[in-house]
């Protein structure tokens, strides 16, 4: 076995050990480990299930803590094993074991990089679930088809990340595609991963709806906002909200359109409109719609507080709702983020939900 290869593997293991130690420090391993024990203790108390909301919140907290604590324990354990095996394999010149350690080290590197990525989540709401609003721009069928492509893209992305995702509301286009859709995404750091996707997405392609096969440009907008938990008080005057019910239709509504189960809330002072038609129960749709309204009002307040600062920081104004963030030029096989300048030629993979590199670039650059 060549010395250079062994030295390289030894250096990688040493580097991973240093980074794992740093991870424990800035992810507050000791604090989170103690908190996990506390949460597990509460969940073992049979009386906790008398309060379903409290039990569910504890279950979510446990899952979030385990994602950090158990992963850090796994990294440390496997690193210790790899270092011990490496010393023995080097002495015995055991090629097969060295190859196995090299493979294990690459897997450990992915784990460490994944945990390091959490440092990018600087927004206090990053750990929350979130909602995604998709809206077709002007341009009729072409824009509505583009909106449906984005809907599919983000559904696939959420599946790849292991997030639970559901379509709360969808308004279909007259010929093809969708006019609007709202998704609810549940998972660890769902908002943190998706928040930089807010903005206008531009598509350039030869249109399948044009008999002359002409080149068309379409726009669709995304708005991502965090779910707000009960610890944050959002004061909504019921008198300011108009409640309409209607029969659900389209995806999510095929089996629930015999009664007026869909719910639309209109908040007068802000002009915000939310709607939910995902469930057969009008009561559950109404509860989900109120959660959406609460989340949108919270996000509106946060944006208002930041508006003066954003005016002063011209370099950051392109992250707003009304600005292009990404360009998809399909006939040139090029997708480019206009904020980070990251681009790729693998358009099929991106449209199939492979957004990790775009999101990583945005978070690293503080978009």
Swiss-Prot record:
Pfam families: PCRF, RF-1. InterPro entries: PCRF, Pep_chain_release_fac_I, Pep_chain_release_fac_I_sf, PrfB. It comes from the Bacteria. It is found in: Cytoplasm. Keywords: Cytoplasm, Methylation, Protein biosynthesis. Its main location: cytoplasm. The keyword Protein biosynthesis applies. GO terms for molecular function: translation release factor activity, codon specific. Signal peptide: none annotated. GO terms for cellular component: cytoplasm. The modification N5-methylglutamine is found at residue 254. The keyword GTP-binding does not apply. Methylated by PrmC. Methylation increases the termination efficiency of RF2. HAMAP family: Rel_fac_2. Belongs to the prokaryotic/mitochondrial release factor family. Peptide chain release factor 2 directs the termination of translation in response to the peptide chain termination codons UGA and UAA. This is Peptide chain release factor 2. It comes from Janthinobacterium sp. (strain Marseille). The gene is prfB.
């Amino acid at each position: 076995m060549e010395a250079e290869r062994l030295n390289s593997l030894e250096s990688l293991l040493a580097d991973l050990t240093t980074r794992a130690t740093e991870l424990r420090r800035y992810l507050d391993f000791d604090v989170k480990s103690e908190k996990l024990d506390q949460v597990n203790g509460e969940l073992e108390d049979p009386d906790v299930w008398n309060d379903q909301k409290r039990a569910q919140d504890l279950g979510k907290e446990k899952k979030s803590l385990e994602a950090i604590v158990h992963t850090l324990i796994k990294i440390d354990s496997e690193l210790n094993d790899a270092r011990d095996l490496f010393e023995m394999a080097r002495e015995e010149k055991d090629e097969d074991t060295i190859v196995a350690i090299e493979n294990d080290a690459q897997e450990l590197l992915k784990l460490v990089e994944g945990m390091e990525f959490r440092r990018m989540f600087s927004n206090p709401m990053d750990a929350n679930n979130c909602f995604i609003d998709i809206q077709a721009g002007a341009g009729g069928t072409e824009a509505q088809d583009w909106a449906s492509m984005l809907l599919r893209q983000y559904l696939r992305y959420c599946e790849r990340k292991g997030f639970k995702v559901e379509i709360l509301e969808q308004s279909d286009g007259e010929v093809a595609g969708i006019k609007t859709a709202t998704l609810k995404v549940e998972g660890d750091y769902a908002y943190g991963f998706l928040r930089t996707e807010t903005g206008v997405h531009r598509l350039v392609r030869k249109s399948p709806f044009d008999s002359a096969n002409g080149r068309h440009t379409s726009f669709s907008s995304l708005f991502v906002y965090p779910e707000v938990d009960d610890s944050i008080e959002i004061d909504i005057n019921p008198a300011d909200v108009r409640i309409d019910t209607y029969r659900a239709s389209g995806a999510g509504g095929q089996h629930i359109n015999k009664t007026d189960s869909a719910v639309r809330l209109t908040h007068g002072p802000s002009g915000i409109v939310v709607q939910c038609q995902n469930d057969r129960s009008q009561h559950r749709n109404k509860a989900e719609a109120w959660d959406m309204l609460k989340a949108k009002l919270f996000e509106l307040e946060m944006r208002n507080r930041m508006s003066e600062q954003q005016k002063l920081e011209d370099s950051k104004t392109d992250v707003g709702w009304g600005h292009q963030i990404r360009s998809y030029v399909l006939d040139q096989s090029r997708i480019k983020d206009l904020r980070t300048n990251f681009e790729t030629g693998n358009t099929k993979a991106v449209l199939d939900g492979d957004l990790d590199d775009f999101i990583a670039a945005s978070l690293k650059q503080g978009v």
